[in-house]
Swiss-Prot record:
It comes from Agrobacterium fabrum (strain C58 / ATCC 33970) (Agrobacterium tumefaciens (strain C58)). Residues 623-691 form the S1 motif domain. Gene3D superfamilies: GHMP Kinase, N-terminal domain, K Homology domain, type 1, Nucleic acid-binding proteins. This is Polyribonucleotide nucleotidyltransferase. Disulfide bonds: none annotated. It is found in: Cytoplasm. It catalyses: RNA(n+1) + phosphate = RNA(n) + a ribonucleoside 5'-diphosphate. Its main location: cytoplasm. NCBIfam families: polynuc_phos, PRK11824.1. SMART domains: KH, S1. The lineage of its organism: Bacteria, Pseudomonadati, Pseudomonadota, Alphaproteobacteria, Hyphomicrobiales. Its cofactor is Mg(2+).
Length: 713
């Protein structure tokens, strides 16, 4: 019934198994990949023909984590997996980025890759395994695909590279880098690092590339016995059309691409495009080519013109040389009632970035397959359509916004203070108000400025820069601070963020094969110079974090209480803590380890709450004198509240030095009295005395007498 095939290798100390032919047999390609005991199912289906009028390649990648994979049931009311989580979105992009460039130009059939995590051993992250499984499924499917692709994670622990570290090892690593590529070239890099230099980062990329070669060999071995017959696909030859169009439009296109201002340049290019369409798509008579074909060839021609200009003249669209960064203006404190704010403008790319400080209640709970955890640093990136002068959908963030926000988050996080140093939840929102390339790196710069404006003690300022590449045969040019057009028409998008001393985040997407180690080295070195230049420009606005928080930011005081006292502070059903919050006005957050965070904009409210909690958890000392309040009287004595919520009995014999007939002869409810803690009885009940304390002065009577006797002698 089943025509099963599998291949198994030892990879970084664990078995990797790729199996096909048993599950999802109606898909064009399906592979179950197992690494350790983590398992994913990858499937791929591609339509047999493109939709009429399709002018782009409709590739969709869906990565999904099933909670049953970790033996869990989804939380929430419906108990069913819902919309994709942030991680699912990010891993979908991670799979998409290295495989997209390997489909042949002109292939426009609807293609969908679905990767499902069906088992998680809580040791091996399924993201890299999902890349491998998707690559294998595509290679077996017969769909036109110039793979296979391999992928690996690289850590850096105690000065050594580690291939595919376990999840628990990542806490020790100063690097989390995922790299993907073919046998000959690197196609994609995604990383977070703790201020590592360019040499270490480049070494990690090459280490990972070498490390996943056995995986590519395994996929090829499986394909030799299990791959379907390749589909016939022959891209159409439009060279004649391109040559004719070049003769018609080259001069005007070259002139248009010398216009430095984006809107004017786009208008000039559109005018040339209109002329070209009018020539090849006459109103009368039958057109030789379709509008989609004319548009695709014109776009190809645009790329050629821009690339030729750069390689021939070393001058770019806006007149800059290869390494010059656009003019930068940095401002902080632009929204004085917010906790921290910045406006970062670089050329025609601009971001308003706002930082907000919150308490432990504001932390985001994340329910992942590996367990529930809390995130205290949030960064949200918004890209409204007006930022590029267009209309469009407004609503929940798309994949691109989530991905760009996470890239900036990775860049900033290594420089944040620890929760012990700065016990605030941090939320940063980046509103992209203008965009002409590198808005994610503008977000990095703006976030650094806004956090410093808010008084968050960043270890060092962070800046980011986007690099580009144009490669034609042996000739190449590395571009600093690329424009949107240079991104679309170039061969590489290489984003580098970090401090003056090292890299904190690196993301690379390469659209062609053949990027060498030498080119990557040049790009990293050029990016370092650009990054330091940007940091210098940012320093014109602010050089280090402000010494104090803004006027409208909450203040937080941290105290620690014994774990066995947490119940007393919270009270039955939360009664005690609710009363403290209501009467003092402060916000209180209690961790399981006894850490208490008290937050308020008022120092008086914080102090009142702190004293209240201290009175609950502290223990009264035997022999000490306390001021208290009579809360109840009885025939045998009076109950006095003398220490926080703690009451104790003053026996009738301890009310006064003379004999007392009735308790009410000496005290009544509500009286303020001085008491001495004499000790505890065998049941732990408090024993208090009033008669040994002078009720007028609060001093011990016995001590006064001794002092008088000593003076008389």
């Amino acid at each position: 019934m089943f025509n099963k095939h599998s291949v198994e290798i030892e990879w970084a100390g664990r078995p990797l198994k790729l199996e096909t032919g048993k599950v999802a047999r109606q898909a064009d390609g399906a592979v179950i990949a197992t690494y350790g005991e983590t398992m994913v199912l990858a499937t791929v289906v591609s339509a047999k023909s493109p939709k009429p009028g399709q002018d782009f390649f409709p590739l969709t990648v869906n990565y999904q984590e099933k909670t049953y994979a970790a033996g869990k049931i989804p939380g929430g009311y419906f108990k069913r997996e819902g919309r994709p989580s942030e991680k699912e979105t990010l891993v979908s992009r991670l799979i998409d980025r290295p495989i997209r460039p390997l489909f042949p130009e002109g292939y426009k059939n609807d293609t969908q890759v679905v990767v499902t995590v069906i088992q998680h051993d809580l040791e091996n992250d399924p993201d890299v395994l999902s890349m491998v499984a998707a690559s294998a499924a595509l290679t077996l499917s017969g769909i036109p695909f110039m793979g296979p692709v391999g992928g690996a994670r690289v850590g850096y622990i105690n000065g050594e590279y580690v291939l595919n570290p376990h999840l628990d090892e990542m806490d020790e690593s100063v690097l989390d880098l995922v790299v993907a590529g073919t046998q000959d070239a690197v196609l994609m890099v995604e990383s977070e690092a703790k201020e590592l230099n360019e040499e270490i980062m480049l070494g990690a990329v090459m280490f990972g590339h070498k490390g996943f070669q056995p995986v590519i060999d395994a996929i090829i071995k499986l394909a030799e016995v299990a791959a379907k017959e390749p589909r016939e696909f022959e891209p159409e030859d439009f060279s004649a059309l391109e040559n004719e169009m070049l003769g018609l439009a080259e001069t005007e296109l070259r002139t248009a691409y010398k216009i430095t201002e984006k809107a004017a340049r786009y208008a000039a290019v559109d005018a040339v495009k209109t002329k070209v369409k009018a020539h090849f798509l006459p109103e009368e008579g039958e057109a030789k080519y379709s509008p989609e074909e004319i548009g695709a060839v014109f776009k190809h021609l645009q790329a050629k013109i821009v690339r030729w200009n750069v390689l021939d003249t070393k001058s770019r669209i806006d007149g800059r040389d290869l390494s010059t960064v656009r003019p930068i203006v940095s401002e902080v404190g632009i929204l004085p009632r917010t906790h921290g704010s910045a406006l970062f403008t670089r050329g025609e790319t601009q971001a308003i970035v706002v930082a907000t400080l919150g308490t432990g209640e504001d932390e985001q709970y994340v329910d992942s397959l590996t367990g529930m955890y809390k995130e205290r640093f949030l960064l949200h990136y918004n890209f409204p359509p007006y930022s590029v002068g267009e209309t469009g959908r407004m609503g929940s963030p798309g994949r691109r916004e989530i991905g760009h926000g996470k890239l900036a988050w990775r860049a900033i996080r290594p420089m944040l203070p620890t929760a012990e140093q700065f016990p605030y939840t941090l939320r940063v929102v980046s509103e992209i108000t203008e965009s002409n390339g590198s808005s994610s790196m503008a977000t990095v710069c703006g976030t650094s400025l806004a956090l410093m404006d808010a008084g968050v003690p960043l270890a060092k300022p962070v800046a980011g820069i986007a690099m580009g590449l144009i490669l034609e045969g042996e000739r190449f040019a590395v571009l600093s601070d690329i424009l949107g057009d240079e991104d679309h028409l170039g061969d590489m998008d290489f984003k580098v963020a970090g401090t003056a001393d090292g890299i904190t985040s690196l993301q690379m997407d390469i659209k062609i094969a053949g990027i060498t180690e030498e080119i990557m080295k040049i790009a990293l070195e050029q990016a370092q110079g650009g990054r330091k230049h940007i940091l210098g420009e940012m320093a014109n606005a602010i050089t280090e974090s402000r010494g104090q928080l803004g006027e409208f930011a909450p203040r937080i005081e941290v105290m620690n209480i014994p774990v066995d006292k947490i119940r007393e502070v919270i009270g039955s059903g939360g009664k005690v803590i609710r009363e403290i919050v209501e009467k003092t006005g402060a916000k209180i957050n209690i961790e399981d380890d006894g850490t208490v965070k008290i937050a308020s904009a008022s120092g008086k409210e914080i102090e009142a709450a702190r004293k209240w909690i201290h009175s609950i958890v502290a223990e009264p000392e035997v022999g000490q004198i306390y001021e208290g309040t009579v809360v109840k009287t009885a025939d045998f004595g009076a109950f006095v509240n003398f220490f926080g919520a703690r009451d104790g009995l003053v026996h009738i014999s301890q009310l006064a030095s003379e004999r007392v007939a009735k308790t009410s002869d000496v005290v009544k409810e509500g009286d303020k009295v001085w008491v001495k803690l004499m000790g505890f009885d065998e049941r732990g009940k408090v024993r208090l005395s009033m008669k040994v304390v002078d009720q007028a002065t609060g001093k011990e009577v016995a001590a006064d007498k001794k002092d008088g006797e000593a003076a008389a002698e």
